[in-house]
C-alpha cells in the first residue's frame, strides 16, 4: 500500500515519500517489521519519539509524529494529531468493517450493553460480534483481552478479520480513554449508546467535565448525522448527552423511566422482582410491551433498554427485539451468580468504582433476607479518591464488609486497604483475596447473600509489575469444594 493512501490529506507529503510502499503500521517499536510505517505517539509515561531509532533499525520506512527529531534517517511526516492520523491509517490499512456497528459509552454498563446487543442481533439471525473489556466474542472465536477499547491497530485488525469472516453486526465499548485518544476514529459507527456517568478515571481526566466531554465525542464527532443516539434518560448528565446528539443531527432515542415512550425512545413504566428475574413494562412508539428479563438488578434494566434501543435504532423490529430480551445472558463477571452455600447465593461483579458498587449492593438487597456481605478492594496506581467513598458505600449498603486486595500494582496493599477502612466502619481486613473470599463463604447462612466485587471476569492479580494468576470464580469454587471435602 502506498504511503499516500495511508496518510490521505492529513499531511503534505513529497511525491517520492508519498510513493513509498508500506507493508504495515505500528506504534510499538518492538513489533516493527521491515516496510512498516511507525507512529511516534507521546504518552503519559514516555514519548514514542524516543523509540524512532529502534523502529528505523527494525525496518520502518517512514515515521509519523508531531515534531521531527534531529537526524532521523528515514522520511518523517509531521501531522497535527498523530493519534487520529494513526486511527485513520489503521482504518485504511484494514478497510473491512461490519456493515452495522454500535458503540456504547458511559461509566458503567458498557460490557453488558455490548454483550446484550450482540445477543439480540444473534437471536434475530445476524452474524454478530462484540469487542470490549472481556475481549472479542464472535461466531468463530473468543479472544480475551484487557483493554476496554483496544489500540487502533488492534481494533481495526479485529474488525477487518471478523468482517471477512462474515460478521455483519458489531457492538463495542467506547471508553473515555479510547475516545479521548482518538482510538475509534475511522470506525464507521451506525449508532451510539450512552449509559450513565459517575466518578471514575479521575487519575486520567482532570475534571468530571473533561470526563463527560470525552464520552460525548461519540455523539459530537463519531456517529454520523442521521445515526441513532440511544441515551439513558434517568441521570443528571442525560440532558447534556441528548443536547450533544441533537446538535449533531442524530436520531435521539431516550430510554428509561424518563424515556420517550410515545416516540422513538423506550419508556420504562413498571418493574418488579420475580425471583432472579424482573418483569418489565415498557412503551415504544405508543405501544406497550411486557418483558420478563432474566437478570437481577435494576441497573441491568437500564443496560437492557440501551441494548434494545441500539438494536431498534439500527433497523431491527421492536417486537422481536423486546422478545429477545427474555433470553439475555449476563456478561461474565457482571452480577454473575457463581454458587451458593447453605442456600445463600454468591455473586461476582466487576464493580470497582463507587456508583457501580452501590448499584450492585442495592440490586442484591432483595435477595438477602438476613445479611448482605461484600468482599472488595481497590486498585493501586488508580484514582485514590474513590477509596474512602467506596468504603462508606459498603458500610451503608452491606451488613458485613471484608476489605481485601485488588490489583495493588506498585502501591503498598496495606495503604490501599487503610484508605477504604477509614470510612468502612465495622469492616474486617483480610489482605489475601482468596482467604477473604473463603472466610466470607464459610460464614454464610440461610438468608444471606454474598457479593465479591472488583475483579469480575479478570484472571490475574497485578502485584508490582507482575500479573499473578487469580480468578474470583476459581476462588469461590475452591472455597466451596473445601467445605464439601
From Swiss-Prot:
Enzyme Commission code: 6.3.2.13
Name under which the protein is recorded: UDP-N-acetylmuramoyl-L-alanyl-D-glutamate--2,6-diaminopimelate ligase
Gene (UniProt): murE
Annotated ATP binding sites: 106-112
Residue sites binding meso-2,6-diaminopimelate per the record: 382, 406-409, 454, 458
HAMAP family assigned: MurE
Reactions catalysed: UDP-N-acetyl-alpha-D-muramoyl-L-alanyl-D-glutamate + meso-2,6-diaminopimelate + ATP = UDP-N-acetyl-alpha-D-muramoyl-L-alanyl-gamma-D-glutamyl-meso-2,6-diaminopimelate + ADP + phosphate + H(+)
PANTHER family: MUR LIGASE FAMILY MEMBER (PTHR23135), UDP-N-ACETYLMURAMOYL-L-ALANYL-D-GLUTAMATE--2,6-DIAMINOPIMELATE LIGASE MURE HOMOLOG, CHLOROPLASTIC (PTHR23135:SF4)
InterPro entries attached to this UniProt entry: Mur-like_cat_sf, Mur_ligase_C, Mur_ligase_C_dom_sf, Mur_ligase_cen, Mur_ligase_N, MurE/MurF_N, UDP-N-AcMur-Glu-dNH2Pim_ligase
Motif (Meso-diaminopimelate recognition motif): 406-409
Cofactor(s), names only, from the UniProt record: Mg(2+)
Subcellular location: Cytoplasm
Entry binding sites for UDP-N-acetyl-alpha-D-muramoyl-L-alanyl-D-glutamate: 27, 29, 148-149, 175, 181, 183
Top EC group: ligase
Alphabetic keyword roster: ATP-binding, Cell cycle, Cell division, Cell shape, Cell wall biogenesis/degradation, Cytoplasm, Ligase, Magnesium, Nucleotide-binding, Peptidoglycan synthesis
Post-translational modification: Carboxylation is probably crucial for Mg(2+) binding and, consequently, for the gamma-phosphate positioning of ATP.
UniProt GO BP: cell division; cell wall organization; peptidoglycan biosynthetic process; regulation of cell shape
High-level lineage: Bacteria, Pseudomonadati, Pseudomonadota, Alphaproteobacteria, Hyphomicrobiales
Role played: Catalyzes the addition of meso-diaminopimelic acid to the nucleotide precursor UDP-N-acetylmuramoyl-L-alanyl-D-glutamate (UMAG) in the biosynthesis of bacterial cell-wall peptidoglycan.
Gene Ontology MF terms in the entry: ATP binding; magnesium ion binding; UDP-N-acetylmuramoylalanyl-D-glutamate-2,6-diaminopimelate ligase activity
This protein's GO CC annotations: cytoplasm
Post-translational modification N6-carboxylysine, affected residues: 215
Amino acid at each position: 500500500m502506498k504511503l499516500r493512501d495511508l496518510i490521505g490529506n492529513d499531511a503534505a507529503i513529497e511525491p517520492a515519500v508519498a510513493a513509498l510502499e508500506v507493508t504495515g503500521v505500528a506504534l510499538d517499536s518492538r513489533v516493527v517489521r521491515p516496510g512498516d510505517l511507525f507512529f511516534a505517539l507521546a504518552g503519559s509515561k514516555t514519548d514514542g519519539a524516543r523509540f524512532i531509532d529502534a523502529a528505523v533499525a527494525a525496518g520502518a520506512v517512514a515515521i509519523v509524529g508531531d515534531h521531527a527529531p534531529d537526524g532521523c534517517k528515514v522520511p518523517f511526516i509531521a501531522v497535527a494529531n498523530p493519534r487520529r492520523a494513526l486511527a485513520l491509517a489503521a482504518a485504511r490499512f484494514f478497510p473491512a468493517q461490519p456493515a452495522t456497528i454500535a458503540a456504547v459509552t458511559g461509566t458503567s454498563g458498557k460490557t453488558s450493553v455490548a454483550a446484550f446487543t450482540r445477543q439480540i442481533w444473534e437471536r434475530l439471525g445476524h452474524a454478530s460480534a462484540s469487542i470490549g473489556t472481556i475481549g472479542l466474542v464472535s461466531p468463530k472465536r473468543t479472544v480475551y483481552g484487557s483493554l476496554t477499547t483496544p489500540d487502533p491497530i488492534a481494533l481495526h485488525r479485529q474488525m477487518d478479520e471478523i468482517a471477512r469472516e462474515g460478521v455483519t453486526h458489531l457492538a463495542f465499548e467506547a471508553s473515555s480513554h479510547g475516545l479521548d485518544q482518538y482510538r475509534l476514529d475511522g470506525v464507521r459507527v451506525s449508532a451510539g449508546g450512552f449509559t450513565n456517568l459517575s466518578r471514575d478515571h479521575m487519575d486520567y481526566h482532570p475534571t468530571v467535565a473533561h470526563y463527560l466531554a470525552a464520552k460525548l465525542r461519540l455523539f459530537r464527532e463519531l456517529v454520523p448525522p442521521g445515526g441513532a443516539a440511544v441515551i439513558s434518560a434517568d441521570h443528571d448528565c442525560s440532558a447534556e448527552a441528548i443536547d450533544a446528539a441533537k446538535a449533531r443531527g442524530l436520531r435521539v432515542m431516550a430510554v428509561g423511566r424518563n424515556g420517550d415512550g410515545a416516540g422513538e425512545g423506550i419508556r420504562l413504566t413498571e418493574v418488579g422482582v420475580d425471583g432472579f428475574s424482573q418483569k418489565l413494562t415498557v412503551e415504544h412508539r405508543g405501544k406497550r410491551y411486557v418483558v420478563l428479563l432474566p437478570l437481577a438488578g435494576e441497573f441491568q434494566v437500564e443496560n437492557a433498554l440501551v441494548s434494545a434501543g441500539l438494536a431498534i435504532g439500527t433497523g431491527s423490529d421492536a417486537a422481536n427485539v423486546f422478545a429477545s430480551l427474555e433470553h439475555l445472558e449476563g456478561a461474565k463477571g457482571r452480577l454473575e451468580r457463581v454458587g451458593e452455600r447453605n442456600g445463600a447465593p454468591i455473586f461476582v461483579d466487576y464493580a470497582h468504582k463507587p456508583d457501580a458498587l452501590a448499584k450492585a449492593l442495592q440490586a442484591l438487597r432483595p435477595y438477602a433476607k438476613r445479611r448482605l456481605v461484600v468482599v472488595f478492594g481497590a486498585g493501586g496506581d488508580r484514582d485514590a479518591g474513590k477509596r474512602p467513598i467506596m468504603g462508606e458505600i459498603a458500610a451503608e449498603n452491606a451488613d458485613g464488609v471484608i476489605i481485601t486486595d485488588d490489583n495493588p500494582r506498585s502501591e503498598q496493599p496495606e495503604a490501599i486497604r487503610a484508605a477504604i477502612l477509614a470510612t468502612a466502619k465495622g469492616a474486617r481486613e483480610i489482605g489475601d483475596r482468596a482467604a477473604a473470599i473463603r472466610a466470607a463463604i464459610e460464614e454464610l447462612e440461610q438468608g444471606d447473600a454474598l457479593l465479591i466485587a472488583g475483579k469480575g471476569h479478570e484472571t490475574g492479580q497485578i502485584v508490582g509489575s507482575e500479573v499473578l494468576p487469580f480468578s474470583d470464580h476459581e476462588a469461590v469454587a475452591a472455597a466451596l469444594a473445601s467445605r464439601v471435602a
